[in-house]
Amino acid sequence: MRLMPSLSFPPRFFHRPRRAAIALMALAALAGGAAHARQAAQAEPLPAQIIRLAQQGRTDEALAKAREYLEREPQDVQMRFIQSNLLAQSGRTDEAEAALVQLTRDYPELAEPYNNLAVLHAASGHLEKAREALETALRLDPGYATARENLGDVYLRLAASAYEQAAARPESAGEARQRLTDKAAAIGKLLR
């Protein structure tokens, strides 16, 4: 069951490859020189290279480049956020969570780390922690649609859990139990 959308890089943290770099790569390709194309690719900003590697499924390579970059620029919030996403995508959720928690401490005004922290909390079954993180994200950025959708999903999961727990209680019998079970099942369908 998918509780929330997968982790995503927030667009406002991204810098698209500069038009000049793209034009340079195209020019090098037209000239037919592989060496020129390699030089042009090196003109691509490192964050864009890392994102491209991740999109190609080369997460370990992207993580290595992110680490290398952060050794030189340890306070680069964009790269730290990208690194946390890469860690999560590679299954290193404890490291991703630690990186996101540190981002929330260093940059408490940013909503995105709270949203992605909530995704990790929800995935590990900590729905109350996820709710708290999402509510923080929305206090910081009330227009953050992804966080709002994710909070709705968390509320649905919490409701389904409450119905399931109520149905399992000994005092819930017959029609009441069936009603509670049906409600939990209906919510489960919404979350698929």
Task: Show which residues each predicted segment covers.
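Short coil turns that delineate tetratricopeptide repeat
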Residues: P74, Y107-P108, P142, E171
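Terminal, low-structured helical/coil segments at or just beyond the last alpha-helical repeat
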Residues: Q39-E44, L156-R192
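Helix-start (N-cap) detector for alpha-helical repeat units in TPR-like alpha-solenoids
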Residues: A43, V77-Q78, A111-E112, A145, ...
